[in-house]
Structures are given as structure tokens and as C-alpha cells.
């Protein structure tokens, strides 16, 4: 039976992990075992935080809309209810951008709703 040499396969696998761990501090970028643990943790955190980022932006948009709407005596939930009642389809992101950047058109929108 012939000898199977697969040293480069294992080396390539380890180098791939060490390449992902570049920039980590201390032994986390030098030693394979700690680098592997740190990259797994970093990748899971990045996945989790990509999901959390969406939630955080929705919170920011809602608070911006709520602050802009309260100047006219409404609150966020009644504003959304009136938008739905008048069949105006604007998502939270666009509403918050209008409220932040173009107050005149936002007041026109509020006048149309109220």
C-alpha cells in the first residue's frame, strides 16, 4: 500500500484559520487552537450582530418618528394607525428620513392624516 501524504491539507486548513485570525491580539493570532476558538467566537458574534443591527435601526427609526409626531400632539402608534387608515404606505425608515431631513413635507403628511 502506498503512503498517503496529506501534510499540506492540514497545513492549508490551519493557515486558513490563522488568516481569519489576523489582527487578533496576542496568541489568538499566532497559536492554532486559540485562533480557532477566537475565530469561531468572532464569526458567531458577527452573525448575531448583523441580526441585532436590524433591530437597533428599527428602534432608532421608531424613536425618531415618535419624537417628530409628538410635536403635533400625536404618538407613534396613533400615527401608524392613521397612516394605515388613510392607506398611505410608508415604511419606518422612509418616515424617519422625511421627519429628519424634510420637516415641511412631514408636516404636510401630518396635516393630511389629522
From Swiss-Prot:
GO molecular function, one term: rRNA binding
Cellular component per GO, a single term: ribosome
Gene Ontology annotations of biological process type: translation
Pfam families: Ribosomal_L20 (PF00453)
Gene3D superfamilies for the chain: 6.10.160.10, Ribosomal protein L20
Keywords, sorted A to Z: Plastid, Ribonucleoprotein, Ribosomal protein, RNA-binding, rRNA-binding
Major localisation: plastid
CDD domains: Ribosomal_L20
Compartment list: Plastid
SUPFAM superfamilies: Ribosomal protein L20
Protein family membership: Belongs to the bacterial ribosomal protein bL20 family.
Protein role: Binds directly to 23S ribosomal RNA and is necessary for the in vitro assembly process of the 50S ribosomal subunit. It is not involved in the protein synthesizing functions of that subunit.
PANTHER family, per the entry: 39S RIBOSOMAL PROTEIN L20 (PTHR10986)
Protein name according to UniProt: Large ribosomal subunit protein bL20c
Organism: Prototheca wickerhamii
Lineage: Eukaryota, Viridiplantae, Chlorophyta, core chlorophytes, Trebouxiophyceae
Gene: rpl20
Amino acid at each position: 500500500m502506498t503512503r498517503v501524504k496529506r501534510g499540506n491539507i492540514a497545513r492549508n486548513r490551519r493557515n486558513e484559520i490563522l488568516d481569519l485570525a489576523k489582527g487578533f491580539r496576542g496568541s489568538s493570532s499566532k497559536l492554532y487552537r486559540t485562533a480557532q476558538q477566537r475565530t469561531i467566537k468572532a464569526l458567531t458574534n458577527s452573525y448575531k450582530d448583523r441580526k441585532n443591527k436590524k433591530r437597533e435601526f428599527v428602534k432608532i427609526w421608531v424613536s425618531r418618528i415618535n419624537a417628530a409626531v409628538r410635536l403635533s400632539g400625536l404618538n407613534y402608534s396613533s400615527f401608524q394607525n392613521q397612516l394605515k387608515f388613510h392607506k398611505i404606505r410608508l415604511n419606518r425608515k422612509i418616515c424617519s428620513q422625511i421627519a429628519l431631513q424634510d420637516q415641511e413635507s412631514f408636516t404636510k403628511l401630518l396635516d393630511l392624516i389629522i
